[in-house]
Amino acid sequence: MKNFKNKVAAITGAGSGIGQQLAVLLAKQGCHLSLSDVNAQGLAQTVELLEKSNVRVTTQKLDVADRDAMKLWAADTVQHHGSVNMIFNNAGVALGSTVEGASYEELEWIVNINFWGVVYGTKEFLPLIKKSGEGHVINISSLFGLTAQPTQSAYNATKFAVRGFTESLRQELDIENCGVS
């Protein structure tokens, strides 16, 4: 997709970092935005950055690991924007700890956000994106999806999983008018 003007993008983790910068960049190109983050204050800061962009912006405070919240957000996006052309599954967390040093709850937290959040975002938005006639699913991973690092076992595992999920999804959608990266 080369032209973002009047397209609609959903972005997870839009309250800071890469997600916030994606929102700013896409808005400058005339793309309407549906933004989500677990941090309402971060979302408000992103909206402030977009005030002069002249695009529609909706926000949803949610945890990407909450399947029902993701379903509601997808429906809300279509209700407010009419359609959706792309999703940036960007939300992620890290924990600098060895496997032995991390609790089960911390390990599950990383997996639920970094992997299942991507799956839920894809599953809920993909039918809507395909319906738009042209679209794209963009799953943000990291270099840790290519190489492992000590004290990042859980994070590495989720990023390798996202990479595998994305490559498989790309093959599944190869014959349809929907890109995956």
Predicted regions and their residues:
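Active-site helix of classical SDR
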Residues: 122, 158
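A glycine-rich helix->loop->beta "capping" turn
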Residues: 55-56, 76-89, 95
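Residue(s) in the substrate-gating loop at a strand-loop-helix junction
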Residues: 142
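Active-site loop immediately N-terminal to the catalytic Tyr-X3-Lys motif
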Residues: 99-100, 147-153, 169
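The beta1-alpha1 cofactor-binding region of Rossmann-like NAD(H)/NADP(H)-dependent oxidoreductases
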Residues: 40-41, 61-72, 104
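Canonical Rossmann dinucleotide-binding motif of NAD(H)/NADP(H)-dependent dehydrogenases/reductases
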Residues: 2-33
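Substrate-binding pocket helix/loop in short-chain dehydrogenase/reductase
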Residues: 98-99, 103-108
